[in-house]
Amino acid sequence: MTDSRSIRFDGRPLAIEDVCAIAARDARAELSADPAFRARIRRGSEFLERLLREDGVVYGVTTGYGDSCTVVIPPELVPELPHHLFAYHGVGLGRMLDPAETRAVLAARLQSLAQGVSGVSVELLDQLAAFIEHDVLPQIPAEGSVGASGDLTPLSYVAAALCGERNVPFMIARPSFGRRRSGWRRSVSSASAAGWMRPWNSTLRSPHSAAAT
């Protein structure tokens, strides 16, 4: 990293130049600690939980996807549904995205979720920000994306890494910003990488609980 400037994720618009700077490790991605921002994220998660209590049927949470939207998932199987979704879409092909491309994917997803309208937890945003900060980069194939949004396949690899599955190239030592070194990376399990990060960021919950909310 050539300088120590930070780009804050707080729900405000992000310029493409900001994403490029994070991708090149010319800037840090900093998730806002502002109480009002975090309260807004929590309200989104609480809204989803309230819908589940009052209605019990929410597309993609307690139902199947696409043409299976009329299939209601039994309550005892709902926690397993996200795992099946990212496993189903984890069939990408071709070369792996390079580190800069992968950082851009993570930054774009963090920016999207930081709007507070996705019903995710603050802990999930913290985990994504920690992946960028510590350069924990899921291995994402460049080909095979499907769906209207065009990002289901690549994001399935991000979700798997957040849940401690698949392998990631990971720094053996904590990154030293301002210096570029080679030979520090090896492939480790996502669970091992997340376990190494936790002492540096005590706010993280387990990858499973963070990704499930």
How should each PLM-predicted stretch be described?
Residues 1-213:
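Conserved, well-structured ligand/cofactor-binding cores
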